[in-house]
Amino acid sequence: MKKFNKITPEGTKDILFEECLSQRTVSERLTHIFKMRGYNEVITPGMEYYDVFDAPNAAIPQYEMYKSTDNKGRLIVFRPDLTLPIARLTATRLQAMEKPIRLYYNQPIYRNRKDLSGRSDETTQAGIELLGASGLKADIEVIAAAVEALSACTENFRLEIGSAKFFGALADELPVSADKKEDIRQTIESKNYAALGDMLDALPKSVYTEAIKKLPRLFGGAEVFAEAEQFCKGHPVLSETLDYMRTLYTALSSLGLDDRLMVDFGLVQRNDYYTGVVFSAYVENYGDAVLMGGRYDTLLKQFDAPMPAIGFAANVDALASVLLDDGRIESCLLYTSPS
C-alpha cells in the first residue's frame, strides 16, 4: 500500500487560488520595485554543490540542508540560501562588469526545518544585492528599497536596524574562543537572557561583559544611542560604529517611517557573514521576520573576488499571508456551469 501518495512532504504544502494570487501579487510588486531601482534579475540553479555553502562563516548548519549526489557522486544541496549562490555567480560570471553591480532575484529556498517549528521547508524569497559599493549611500539605497518593498504590501511593519560590527567589537574583547563567541551570539539571537547572563558571569567582569548583557535591552528610538555611548568610551571601533549608526538612523528617519523605525543593538543575525549594518522587518501579528538583510563585505573574498556588498531577502510567502489577512486580495475563484 502506498502510504504517502496523497500527502506532501513535511514542511511543504499545496497552494491554491487566493494564496496563489497573493504570492504572485507580492512577487510582481517587489520585482517591479527592484527593476525601477535599476536592479537586474538573475536566476541561480535550484541545486548547488555543497562546497558553495560550506564556507567557514556561511552559518547554515549542514543538517538544515537537503542533500543529494549527482551522477558522479559529488555532494549537492537544494539551495538553502540565495546570497551565497549570487556571490558565487558574481565572482565567476560578473567580475568584468562595472561596479557597483545591482542584482535581484525571486526564487525558492529549501531548509530542513526542525519538526513542529511551524516553518515551511520551501519558501520563496525576493531580494536584492548591491555588490561593489560601500558606505552610507549604499546602505541607505538598499534599506530604502526594503522600505518601499514592505510598503507595497503593508503599512503595519516595523523596521529594526542594528550592527554586526558593534557586537563583534564587544565580543573580541572577551577572553574566549571563536566558538564561545558564536555561542554567545546564538544565545542573544534566541533571546535566552538567563543563559546569556550565566555565560558572561563565568567570565572576568568587565565593561564589555556588562555591555553584552545589556545589548538585548538597547532597543528603541534615538535615545538608544545615548545609552550605548557608555560602553564606547576609549574604544575607537565601538565609537565609530555608534556614530555611523546614529547617522544612518537620522538619514532613514527622513523616509517617513516615524515610530516604525527602531534601533536594536541586540539584533545579531544568524548569518555570520554580516560585517556592518543589519536589519530586520516585522509585521503585526506575524511572529518571524518578513525581511532580513545586512552588509557582508568579506563574503566574496571566499570566492576569490573581494568586494563590499549589502542586500536583503523578503519572505514572499509571509508577505502574501499578510495581504490575505489584511483582505487586500479579492477572491479569484471561478465558477462554471456544468455542461
What are these regions (language model features)?
Residues 1-84, 92, 140:
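TRNA-binding/sensing appendages of the translation machinery
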Residues 2, 98-99:
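Phosphate/dinucleotide-binding and metal-coordinating scaffold of catalytic cores
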Residues 19-20, 25-37, 48-49, 83-96, ...:
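Positively charged, Gly/Ser-enriched RNA/tRNA-binding surfaces
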Residues 47-62, 162-169, 267-276:
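Beta-rich nucleic-acid/ligand-interaction surfaces
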Residues 64-70, 176-195, 283:
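Acidic, His- and aromatic-enriched active-site or binding-groove loops in soluble protein domains
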Residues 138, 159-162, 171, 188:
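Internal, well-ordered alpha/beta segment that forms a basic, Gly-enriched binding/recognition surface
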Residues 153-156, 164-171, 180:
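Extended alpha-helical scaffolds
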